[in-house]
Amino acid sequence: PGAVVLAVNDLCLPCSDPFGMDLSHLNLEVRAGEVVGIAGVSGNGQRELMYALSGEEPCADAASIQIQGQAAALLGPQARRSLGLHFVPEERLGRGAVPSLSLAHNMLLTRQEAVQRSGWIDMNQLQRQAQGVIDRFKVKASGPQATAKSLSGGNLQKFIVGREMEAQPRLFIVSQPTWGVDVGAAAQIRGEILALRDAGCAVLVVSEELEELFEISDRLHVMAKG
């Protein structure tokens, strides 16, 4: 593995959800060219950690999360994307995709370059990119104009994972990467994760599937009670 891309330093984050889990003095690092897995029964702080890493839950201590050496804990999701972070949340609809928008428009969540300086959106570019994800990840959809909510859970999962991977991330964080997909698609997603690693990307995978984590992880951590 190469240089540290993600560093989590003594992260403490009280949970705003009464049914959630506080994060307490959590330390973690992910280096370029490695896959780090996080195992554990759901409800032990994995979701809260994902919110903290994605920028949905800003942290009080700016240095508690560093991306490529830059303090990132106070940055929002878009600013973190500019540092090379791409993210697949556990919740597909609502967080990973906007249900009522087309797949092409959902590409905008990670393809800000399609918005021109004039403010116009390059729809041809978005449609080409969406079609590329559909083809590469064998997403069953009528085309780039299909709405996100029209896809089955497994096909939407493939689209979201593919959209984030095709952005060529420096840091790729994914929660439950193969939930709801068939055996063939799960094998492809795992293979694509390993290909990202081999290309020098730092990868963090949260999964309840131990066999999956054993297959793809270079290092493995277990979360318990935050």
Which ranges hold each PLM region?
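Glycine-rich phosphate-binding loops of nucleotide-dependent enzymes
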Residues: 1-226
